[in-house]
């Protein structure tokens, strides 16, 4: 297993990246190339900082005061082994975890769903920006609650 992930940044406090006040950890790299993406500057793989899963957990533990974390990017699902390892460590520390992906719900592996509490899905579509969803950039994106690995309902 690859225990080094490509990392873009960390925000200690955000009210826009999932339910409640959360911290946000950004994976580096995304091949979706959504026109108008607000994180396009972190899309090209190979340009991010390489850190170990252990270093990522230490960074999150030090900066996330309320145990609510959103994993975003880039596209976290493009580093699946590293994502699983990080989510497993965070779950073991009782974090409330939200995963942001530009993919559809069916692209989120079951073993990833087992490790998270929320998932935001959908590509950013600039023509669908309407401001109705506080957790997404366009109206085709949705936030779902996940309970025991099962998607239970759409939150937004």
Positions of the model-derived regions?
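Short secondary-structure boundary/capping segments
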Residues: 15, 110, 133-135
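Residues at the C-termini of beta-strands that transition into short coil/loop
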Residues: 11, 120-123, 147
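P-loop/Walker A phosphate-binding loop and immediately adjacent motor/lid segment at beta-alpha junctions
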Residues: 77-88, 129-156
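Conserved Radical SAM active-site core
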Residues: 2-8, 21, 39-99, 105-111
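Short secondary-structure boundary segments
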Residues: 101-103, 122-124
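Receiver (REC) domain switch/active-site residues of two-component response regulators
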Residues: 117
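N-terminal pre-triad scaffold of radical SAM enzymes
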Residues: 6-33
């Amino acid at each position: 297993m690859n225990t080094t992930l490509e990392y873009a940044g960390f925000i200690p406090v955000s009210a826009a990246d999932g339910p409640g006040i959360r911290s946000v950890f950004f994976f580096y790299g995304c091949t979706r190339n959504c026109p108008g993406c607000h994180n396009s500057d972190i899309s090209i793989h190979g340009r991010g900082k390489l850190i170990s899963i252990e270093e990522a957990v230490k960074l999150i533990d030090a900066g996330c005061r309320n145990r609510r974390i959103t994993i975003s990017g880039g596209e976290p699902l493009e580093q699946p082994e590293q994502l699983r390892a990080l989510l497993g460590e965070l779950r073991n520390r009782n974090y409330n975890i939200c995963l942001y992906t530009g993919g559809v719900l069916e692209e989120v592996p079951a073993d990833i769903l087992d490790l998270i509490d929320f998932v935001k899905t959908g590509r950013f579509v600039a023509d669908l920006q309407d401001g109705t969803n506080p957790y997404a950039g366009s109206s085709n994106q949705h936030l779902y609650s996940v309970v025991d690995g099962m998607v239970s309902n759409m939150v937004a």
